[in-house]
Amino acid sequence: MASPPAHRSSKAADEELPKASSTFHPSLWGSFFLTYQPPTAPQRANMKERAEVLRERVRKVLKGSTTDQLPETVNLILTLQRLGLGYYYENEIDKLLHQIYSNSDYNEKDLNLVSQRFYLLRKNGYDVPSDVFLNFKTEEGGFACAAADTRSLLSLYNAAYLRKHGEEVLDEAISSTRLRLQDLLGRLLPESPFAKEVSSSLRTPLFRRVGILEARNYIPIYEKEATRNEAVLELAKLNFNLQQLDFCEELKHCSAWWNEMIAKSKLTFVRDRIVEEYFWMNGACCDPPYSLSRIILTKITGLITIIDDMFDTHGTTEDCMKFAEAFGRWDESAIHLLPEYMKDFYILMLETFQSFEDALGPEKSYRVLYLKQAMERLVELYSKEIKWRDQDYVATMSEHLQVSAESIGANALTCSAYAGMGDMSITKETFEWALSFPQFIRTFGSFVRLSNDVVSTKREQTKDHSPSTVHCYMKEHGTTMDDACEKIKELIEDSWKDMLEQSLALKGLPKVVPQLVFDFSRTTDNMYRDRDALTSSEALKEMIQLLFVEPIPE
């Protein structure tokens, strides 16, 4: 939840809608996705048939890979994962990863291989040691890498971002290689594939990129590589285009739901960002089986946006407290507690949750109960933040994050995603673990909160608001806003290390659980790096076009 404004006393009658004080720009997409027309059934069937043939051709290549050809095997797995194809070969990849981890008989003097092996294993949950990079340290403190060996330099840079606290060799690798890559970039042809890879890595290290966006951007780069596998390339293009069809149908459904929600509730003051919210959630759950997760996530994010804007900008304290009381009842009879302008929204919200139960069916509808609990907790915390606001209370950073790391919606998002997954490894125990707000999810929540605050605080100077984490740090440590923002950026960087350490220590949970949290972190980083792209969504327009509007030429 963004920082709320100072308290305004309520003198309006229940029937009056609070006046909008925001200047949110209108949707950039209007009814664009509502008019989407899918290809004919025969066209789609033909695409799926071709994709299945190609998947089996690639599977044969993967099954023929061994650790005896370690560089080729590691590179193939990395390529498949970057192209968004890893999902189809999870069993084969898991088997190869175990062999790669168990086999220590490889050339430890090959910096590119060492870096790619380290990256691949840590990314996939293996806690391999970083001291293997000590072999490449020079007396001057740099890393031994021939000037012409640019690929190894880039691999080392990307591998080093899978670092934990105290791994000085990886901290030094980032500092050293970044300078060399920046210098190298100035000497490369700007349109060359390798220049694009270097530029992308300097902006966003490979581990932190949104998977579906990386696939879309990497396909044309891979197409120009001399060592490309034609079957892999053709499959990557076809697979992306098939996914895009699914995404557009889901966007059409979510857009129709949103338009009905706003039209019937008459809450026209809220941010109209359903396309951007789908884009955001898609980045966390892009694999083919997770269609229902994407839909539930998008609708939950839309509901949170409405509630956030009511609490944040438009609702009086009295009205918001009435809403909080009614919220936990989950019953139409509670509308008598609400001011008139909230009643239709409340009913529509109940209908939305009922639709989740219907979609999940009798065996999995229990999951919605956990999702409701997560939302109840969210609204409870919004109410606490309003009380802080009204008291002009400035918490310490630690106290603020105890509340705001949770009120940012981390539990609601993770439970929404788990709820829609067909994977039967997601059990009641998974939800109970998530709702206990364990340290791993708390760290993720802190990451989202800090990422949001560091880009929104200056914008919120234009209106009354309660303190963000930036203001809390400024008061607690007596610093300027710029200094506080720099410190919070350091804390954000530390959060990546914390999440990696905590994920490697998780036991007894489905593999998708930590993967999902990292995917949420990646897509959140994309939303909040340098700007609040949800509120000012022009920054996302090109990315949305790439994912949902422009198919890849085959």
From Swiss-Prot:
Effect of residue 411 to I: No effect on the product profile. Production of (S)-beta-bisabolene and 7-epi-sesquithujene
Signal peptide bounds: none
Binding site for Mg(2+) 2: 308, 312
Highest taxon listed in the record's lineage: Eukaryota
Additional comment: The allele found in cv. B73 encodes an inactive enzyme while the two alleles found in cv. Delprim encode an active (TPS5A) and an inactive (TPS5B) enzyme.
Function: Sesquiterpene synthase involved in the production after herbivore attack of a blend of volatiles that attracts natural enemies of herbivores. Converts farnesyl diphosphate to sesquithujene, (S)-beta-bisabolene, (Z)-alpha-bergamotene, sesquisabinene B and several minor products. Can also act in vitro as a monoterpene synthase, converting geranyl diphosphate to (S)-(-)-limonene, beta-myrcene and 11 other monoterpenes.
This protein's name: Sesquithujene synthase A
Organism listed in the record: Zea mays
